[in-house]
Amino acid sequence: MFTELRSKLSPPRARAGAVRPGFGERPDVDASAHFSFCQTLLEHTVSAENIPCHLPRTPGTSLTWHDSRSQRASSSRPIKLLQQPGSEIPQARLYSDHYGLYHTSPSLGGLTRPVVLWSQQDVCKWLKKHCPHNYLVYVEAFSQHAITGRALLRLNADKLQRMGLTQEAQRQEVLQQVLHLQVREEGRSLKLLSQASFGNMS
């Protein structure tokens, strides 16, 4: 009795290999749709990778950090400092005037460097030209103290005495020539400044 009642109440078992209606076909449909989607995506990716990509690149440009840094270094432009209006001096004119007009060295007929840039050898040549009588005495004293052009313009009687020129006549001779040199350098400096100002106005 109980066996018959249980057989009536319990639902019939599905046979092996049987497929439920409306349920067994959906996994196959989902799997096929997923497979076709993946295949389409893969084909699109491969086709995109196979497309040759040529970026327009002008000469001198670069796409890497190192190349761009070298490019900036090679194409760097001089930085112009801020100046007041009307106070700018053309650099080309200033350099040409400084090294073409502002020259007083005795070695090449007054066409080399300014006195402040004279070496010890230039000072010795100047002494030989302007103080020929006691030239050897002056050259020995100036060489021992390494007198250059800048130091030559700053000489006075006390410095010459400490350098070993004990005679007053010798000191006066050197100081007189140094004074002439200072006046000549001052005049050349004023000429350079006036030419630079005139070039700025024009």
Swiss-Prot record:
Alphabetical list of InterPro entries matching this protein: Aveugle-like_SAM_dom, SAM, SAM/pointed_sf, SAM_domain-containing_protein
Domain SAM span(s) in chain numbering: 118-184
Disordered, as annotated region: 1-22
Disulfide bond positions: none
Highest taxon in the source lineage: Eukaryota
PANTHER family recorded: STERILE ALPHA MOTIF DOMAIN CONTAINING PROTEIN 10, STERILE ALPHA MOTIF DOMAIN-CONTAINING PROTEIN 10
Name this polypeptide is given: Sterile alpha motif domain-containing protein 10
Organism the protein comes from: Mus musculus (Mouse)
